[in-house]
Structure formats: structure tokens, C-alpha cells
């Protein structure tokens, strides 16, 4: 393993660019593996905006100075210490590229960030547990502007790290410390966790059902907060939380009493007020982009719930 970690980020979208910025700041030798259609844009470099809590003029920051690859052959010609998967859960399963990339990247540590309940099990087909680190994405990033008239001097990727946030990572003791050390050296607030999959399973279940309900309400907070919509979402969220707890051998007992329609009524306006961007528009834009992933995750709750003999009737798609 080299002193300067050689890092390959798969996917140079909203998330890949942000992790790339921190890893480059840590001194990593950085490359992206992108689809051919994005290669020119990536080679020109990206424009980043870091959002704070205060509304002030935004300074675009140029993010460049990394390699750009478009094929496994190019990747296989180099040695890698870390491979970061910055794509959706559905992109992981599209074709056979993950297995091929695993063969092209030798003994590298793989860092997965995907949210679906069975992503880790799925990846273990190709990457042994001794080399697989799991992380959760605590920031929000998006292509800016989200809508016309916003305060960005030119198009780019905006990101917001909520105050006091720590991004959890878990994995084998021989690999995890180096990933965390590297991120911290770049100024990223990383922390070690016993089991990220378990930490995030329940919040992710609530978020997924919420997003599914918001989509059914036409991405409108006002319509989402109406009685019938809230009732449906709260029942489905209870089922998803129980599936998530059962699958990760965790407990839902502390969360279930809190899961009430009133919780969404209370939290949504607070969240909208705290975010330094238009939350309603972000949710619509982002979760339309990863809509297939939300459907995959909903189906996964149903499949795993049925297998475990748990109720799933409110998680089923409406006909
Ligand atoms: N952005 C956020 O605020 C945020 C927050 C928390 C979690 N996440 C999660 O992070 C994941 C990525 O989100 P994102 O916002 O970064 O999405 P994104 O902006 O769409 O970026 C993903 C990029 O990876 C590309 N890609 C897909 N398969 C690839 C492959 N085999 N090789 C190389 N590139 C590939 C995609 O291409 P195409 O455009 O052709 O699909 C896209 O350019 C999702 O699971 C999302 O739910 C995102």
C-alpha cells in the first residue's frame, strides 16, 4: 500500500464529487471512473459550492487535478488502494460491471455508500468482507441551481454538511482506520461505527417510505401533510421499520411509539426551515433522479418482510 492512497471513485455525480474533494484535500491520488458520456465534462473539472447556514454570496470552487477513466482496461493498468462506490443501489445491479471492476482492482479496499437494505449482502458476492468498508452519506448535494433565479453565479454542484454531522463508517479493523484517517486528513467529519448498516437501517426505512409518499403527493409538502396521505405513510413506515430492524437484528421498540402522523407534521416544516436551500425542490429533483432506487428499496422491504413473516400490506404499491 502506498503512502499516498490511490483512490478510484466510481461515479462523478453529486456524491462522488463531494467525496472526491475531501479525498483530494487529504492528498490522495484521485481518479474517477465515469461513463463515456460524462468523460469530457469530468476532464474539464467541476465547480463546487459549499453551503453554510448563513445566506451569503457563494464562491464557486474549481475541483480538478484528478484522473478520469472510462473502462475497466484503463483501471486495470494501475494499482488502487481504495475503490469508492458513488452510484445508486440500482446502478450497482445494472450489468456485470461490479464483478469485472473487482477483478481489475486487485486487493483494494472497497467503500460502499448505498442505502438499500441488502446492498452489502449483494456486494459480498464480489468483495470479501475483509476488504469491504460501509459508509453512510450525511451531506446533501445536488446540481445547482435547483431552480431558476437561485444565487449561484454559474452551474455546479452544491453541497451542505449539516452542522455537527459525523459520517459513520464501519468495516474490518485492518482497513477501516485508514479510510477514516484519510477522510479526516481532508477535513471530512468521519467517525467509526460498529455497524453502519444497522445504524442507518431504521432512519433509511422511514426516509424511503416518506419519499415514496411524497412522490405519491406530487412532491408537494402541502398535499403530503394531508390526513389520508400521512396515515398511509405512517402505516407503511411502521412496517418498513420492523423489516429493517428484523433484517439487521436490531430493535424497533424505541422508534415505533414515535412514528405517528404528528411526527411528520412537526418535523417537515422544521427541516424545511433549517436547510439552506429549497428542501421541497431538492427532494423532488433528487428522488426523481434516483426514483428507481426508491422503488427497489420499497420492493426489498416487501420481499424481506414476507420472508420474515412480517406485515407488509401498506408497503405494497397502490393499484
Ligand atoms: N446527492 C445526495 O444528496 C445524496 C445524499 C445521500 C445519499 N445519496 C445517495 O448516493 C448515491 C449517488 O447519488 P448521487 O446524487 O451522487 O447521484 P448522481 O448525481 O446521479 O451520480 C451518480 C453518477 O454515477 C454514474 N454511474 C452509474 N453507474 C455507473 C458506473 N457503472 N460507472 C460509472 N459511473 C456510473 C451515474 O450516471 P447516470 O447519470 O447515467 O445514471 C451518475 O453520473 C445514491 O444512492 C443516492 O441515493 C445521495
Regions found by a protein language model. Give the residues of each.
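NAD(P)-dependent Rossmann-like dehydrogenase/reductase catalytic/cofactor-binding core
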Residues: 238-319
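Rossmann-fold dinucleotide-binding core
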Residues: 116-203
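Generic structural signal for well-ordered, non-membrane alpha-helical segments
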Residues: 16, 172, 176, 229-237, ...
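NAD(P)+-binding Rossmann beta1-loop-alpha1 motif at the extreme N-terminus of oxidoreductases
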Residues: 1-59, 182
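Short beta-strand/turn micro-motifs composed of small residues
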Residues: 11, 34, 87, 114, ...
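Rossmann-like NAD(P)(H) cofactor-binding subdomain of soluble oxidoreductases
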Residues: 60-153
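Active-site-proximal catalytic alpha-helix in oxidoreductases
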Residues: 196-241
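Helix-loop-beta segment of a Rossmann-like dinucleotide-binding subdomain
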Residues: 153-167, 217-226, 277-288
